[in-house]
Swiss-Prot record:
Protein species of origin: Francisella philomiragia subsp. philomiragia (strain ATCC 25017 / CCUG 19701 / FSC 153 / O#319-036)
Functional note: Catalyzes the attachment of serine to tRNA(Ser). Is also able to aminoacylate tRNA(Sec) with serine, to form the misacylated tRNA L-seryl-tRNA(Sec), which will be further converted into selenocysteinyl-tRNA(Sec).
InterPro entries registered for this protein in UniProt: aa-tRNA-synt_IIb, aa-tRNA-synth_II, aa-tRNA-synth_II/BPL/LPL, Ser-tRNA-ligase_type_1, Ser-tRNA-synth_1_N, SerRS_1_N_sf, SerRS_core, tRNA-bd_arm
Swiss-Prot/TrEMBL GO biological process terms: selenocysteine biosynthetic process; seryl-tRNA aminoacylation
Enzymatic class: ligase
CDD domains per record: SerRS_core
Family to which the UniProt record says this protein belongs: Belongs to the class-II aminoacyl-tRNA synthetase family. Type-1 seryl-tRNA synthetase subfamily.
Free-text domain note: Consists of two distinct domains, a catalytic core and a N-terminal extension that is involved in tRNA binding.
Keyword check for Protein biosynthesis: yes
Binding residues annotated for L-serine, in chain numbering: T233, A234, E235, E287, S387
Name this polypeptide is given: Serine--tRNA ligase
Self-association and partners: Homodimer. The tRNA molecule binds across the dimer.
EC number: 6.1.1.11
Length: 426
């Protein structure tokens, strides 16, 4: 959530920046609401002052044994008006809060302005995409897996429905090996603390990281006595660890990682990526989360992104880094780098990780702060998150980039030990 005071002091700037994100901020309406709120608060203070004065007068009369019935009525009238104002003020404040909750984060100054992914800016490339023989074009990962009888979409459709998968045998083992490889790298090489977190969260957590109220349709919600939702990403439970906390500044930065399934309805993506593992209702990620101080926020984004890159480099998967434009960034993000891995069958790069610096946007929603003895009052932390990596998309990238003409799949050297010495799937 944006700082209400900053908005009031910088209305035109905020409106311009929000417009680059496709959000139309009605300045006149906001000013009118703020003016009305101020008037109501001033009237409340005025009435409370009158009530206090009258109450003192009643006390004086009673102490002297005098009748005070003539001014009791005034107190009752004031109390009645205060109740009306309280209701109006609450409704108005709820309206203002809903407006604030609907606003996306303001982009950092170096974020390119653009309407969608076509205007993202490529930062760099790593690795060289493999060239396939003209007579042996790259096969799609879904076809390779089905021929090997190790990826089964039909079984998943029978069990559940579309956009689910059953992995079998050595490909299921490869999926598990990837997860362990990523966790080991981040905990042993990059200094992350590994967490095991709930896969269901309450609404407060979803408001804290920005999934609610805007993205309610993309969530799978439980029915019955529990108002919980399945997590769309481990970012939600991990980041909410610091909700309503005042952290010791000396304990920052904090680096957290967790492997979880993620559940998304994929509302709005009908007809897109209907084949294969690219877009599933249930998929797994190894998530990276940083909690740091404001001065280190942008620097931490570079570090987090490099940690996700290391996974791709160790697996020798060609990729590129793109800086997202204003129109393509996530709701809570201030600045985002996407890592896109090369997919031979599509002859293009596809997103495998999104690394975002959220500034104090989530922290303000969560009331997540830090303090040290030299500070007059607690300050909001900065939060960052990214995939390190999406396991299913890494799996499909390996299947396609390491496919052989005979239909087998070579195992990247970094994973052979995790595969129990298996070097090829056939």
């Amino acid at each position: 959530m944006l700082d209400a005071k900053y908005i009031k002091d910088n209305l035109e700037e905020v409106a311009e920046k929000l417009a680059t994100r496709g959000y139309q901020f009605d300045i006149a309406e906001f000013k009118a609401q703020e003016a009305k709120r101020k008037d109501l608060q001033e009237r409340t203070q005025e009435l409370q002052s009158q009530r206090n004065t009258i109450s003192k007068e009643i006390g004086k009369r009673k102490s002297k044994g005098e009748d005070a019935s003539d001014i009791f009525a005034k107190v009752n009238d004031i109390n009645d008006e205060l109740k009306v104002i309280e209701k109006v003020l609450k409704d108005l404040q709820d309206c203002i809060n809903n407006t604030l909750l609907s606003m996306p984060n303001l982009p950092a100054d170096d974020v390119p302005v653009g309407k969608d992914e076509s205007e993202n800016v490529e930062i760099k490339k790593w690795g060289t995409p493999r060239e396939f023989h003209p007579e042996a074009q790259a096969k799609d990962h879904a076809d390779i897996g089905e021929i090997l009888n190790m990826i089964d979409f039909k079984a998943a459709a029978k069990i559940t429905g579309s956009r689910f998968v059953v992995l079998k045998s050595k490909i299921a083992k490869l999926h598990r090996a990837l997860t362990q490889f990523m966790l080991d790298m981040h905990t042993e090489k990059h200094g992350y603390e590994e967490l095991y977190v709930p896969y269901m969260v309450n609404n407060d957590s979803l408001y804290g990281t920005g999934q609610l109220p805007k993205f309610s349709e993309d969530l799978f919600k439980l029915e019955g006595d529990f108002e919980y939702s399945l997590i769309p990403t481990a970012e939600v439970p991990i980041t909410n660890l610091v909700r309503d906390e005042i952290l010791d500044t000396e304990s920052l930065p904090r680096y957290y990682t967790a492997h979880t399934p993620c559940f998304r309805s994929e509302a709005g993506s009908y007809g897109r990526d209907t084949k294969g593992l690219i877009r599933q209702h249930q998929f797994e990620k190894v998530e990276l989360v940083h909690i740091t101080i404001a001065d280190k926020g942008e620097e931490s984004l570079e570090l987090l992104t490099s940690h996700a890159e290391k996974v791709l480099q160790k697996l020798n998967l060609p990729y590129r880094v793109v800086k997202l434009c204003t129109g393509d960034m996530g709701f809570s993000a201030k600045k985002t780098y996407d890592l896109e891995v090369w997919i031979p069958s599509q002859n293009t790069y596809r997103e495998i990780s999104s690394c975002s610096w959220c500034g104090d946007f989530q922290a303000r929603r969560m009331k997540a702060r830090h303090k040290n003895p030299s500070m007059k009052k607690p300050e909001l932390v900065h939060t960052l998150n990214g995939s390190g990596l999406a396991v299913g998309r890494t799996l499909l990238a390996i299947i396609e980039n390491y496919q052989q003409e005979d239909g087998s799949i070579m195992i990247p050297e970094a994973l052979i030990n995790y595969m129990g010495g298996i070097s090829v799937i056939k």
